[in-house]
């Protein structure tokens, strides 16, 4: 790969990340009824299973679909199911999903999502605002 190809690949990756971020945020807004941004909305034990699955999937992509399909069929929590479906319906990478929902010391919650990833969410909001202004 020469320098030009590498730069083109980086540009494509950035563009894909912006598109993926927008799809993730749109999907979450559609699937989760947002109230007060700091109101905890925990996924409970399903969220813990989801994070474990995401870790496995990030390391062993080939096994991830079977594991996800099994988990999706057994989940009772629609929010956890919605996050899993991002991977297979919208093509979202596990790494991006984990980026928004992962923390070792805290439960998965909207409070955590807003606090820990406020900068990333602000970038998504800015991108969506730019898209709306340009439309």
Q: In which residue ranges do the predicted regions lie?
A:
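Short, basic interhelical loop/turn and adjoining N-cap
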Residues: 101-119
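Generic detection of well-ordered alpha-helical segments
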Residues: 66, 77-81, 118, 122
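DNA major-groove recognition helices of helix-turn-helix
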Residues: 113-131
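Residue-level detector of secondary-structure transition/capping positions
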Residues: 88-92, 105, 121
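Short alpha-helical segments used as structural interaction elements across diverse proteins
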Residues: 11, 62, 82-84, 112-114
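N-terminal interaction/assembly modules
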Residues: 1-74, 96, 102-107, 126-135
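Short amphipathic alpha helix immediately N-terminal
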Residues: 75-96
